[in-house]
């Protein structure tokens, strides 16, 4: 799919090397169709890496998309050049009058804090409310999934005895749903988190549908409002080396770091990772864009409500 991206975004050149079709604004304006408007609220510390990971997956349909990036005003990133943030990101307050066909809200390295103690909790709560009548479908990832479930539905999170770290087999519980069209009976999802939401809390709420889980990592995917909200507790967007980089980073800090499970070939960290989630990750984003955005969003974007 041709993605319409801001001129000079670093991800453009990175993805062109992977033979992924992206276009800048100059080329996109010559095509007489309405692109889908997608906004990414990127809360991850490594902004450029996350941008590239998500754009790689968004590129997997024939639809043109106009991708923009949102930031919270109440938090200043420490790991991304300020020039990059100024060039490619806008504060929520400057975007709140716009409407979008789709939105992705990423994870954040704050999961061990109480939600209300996060310094941008008030602002992100406002964004959660805003998305409900300004976006056709919103995808919440990892910490954002826990935060969205807590804010909208009162679902608590619980600390884990040890970090959920690795790639785990998932079961589709509602295979008839369009989000799983083309899926096998099982698929794999990377996880990297210290907290969880629990199955019994999801099942006790009639507004929520548990659509994928795992005996190892528990709740994986939850759907609400007929597909206008998806909550994914793992990281289908992760590149092949993300868990490896995280493992080596933590090993440099301390010795008592568990190796990511089901990740390295022969479970040997000296060998290359074995990617088992890429095909389903592409299919998941393709289905979300096609069935829950393109098929549902009004042509007149101002009619989203």
List PLM regions with ranges.
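Amide-donor transfer/coupling interface in amidating biosynthetic enzymes
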Residues: 1-74, 89-95, 99, 126, ...
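Short, glycine/charged-enriched secondary-structure capping and boundary segments
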Residues: 53-55, 84, 117-120, 153-156, ...
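N-terminal beta-loop-helix "entrance" segment that forms/cooperates
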Residues: 73-86
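Helical hinge/lid and interdomain linker segments adjacent to catalytic or ligand-binding clefts
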Residues: 85, 89-92, 115
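Cysteine-nucleophile active-site neighborhood
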Residues: 100, 105-174
């Amino acid at each position: 799919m041709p993605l319409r991206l801001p001129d000079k975004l670093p991800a453009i050149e990175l993805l062109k090397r992977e033979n992924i079709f992206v276009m800048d604004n100059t080329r996109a304006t010559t095509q007489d169709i309405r692109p889908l408007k997608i906004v990414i609220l990127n809360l991850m510390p490594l902004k450029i890496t996350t941008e590239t990971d998500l754009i790689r997956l968004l590129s997997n349909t024939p639809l043109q998309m106009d991708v923009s990036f949102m930031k919270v005003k109440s938090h200043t990133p420490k790991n991304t050049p300020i020039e990059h943030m100024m060039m490619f990101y806008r504060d929520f307050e400057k975007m709140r009058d716009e409407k979008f066909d789709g939105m992705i809200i990423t994870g954040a390295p704050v999961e061990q804090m109480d939600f209300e103690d996060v310094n941008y909790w008030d602002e992100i709560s406002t964004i959660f409310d805003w998305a409900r009548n300004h976006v056709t479908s919103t995808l919440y990832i990892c910490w954002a999934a826990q935060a969205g479930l807590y804010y909208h539905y009162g679902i608590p999170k619980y600390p884990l005895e040890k970090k959920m770290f690795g790639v785990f087999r998932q079961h589709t519980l509602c295979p008839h749903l369009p989000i799983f069209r083309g899926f096998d009976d099982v698929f794999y999802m990377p996880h990297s988190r210290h907290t969880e939401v629990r199955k019994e809390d999801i099942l006790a709420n009639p507004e929520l549908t548990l659509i994928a889980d795992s005996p190892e990592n528990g709740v994986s995917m939850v759907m609400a409002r007929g597909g206008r909200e998806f909550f994914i507790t793992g990281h289908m967007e992760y590149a092949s080396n993300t868990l490896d980089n995280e493992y080596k980073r933590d090993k440099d800090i301390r010795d008592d770091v568990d190796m990511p499970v089901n990740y390295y070939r022969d479970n040997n960290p000296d060998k290359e990772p074995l990617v088992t989630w890429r095909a389903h990750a592409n299919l998941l984003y393709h289905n979300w864009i096609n069935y829950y955005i393109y098929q549902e969003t009004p042509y007149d974007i101002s009619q989203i409500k």
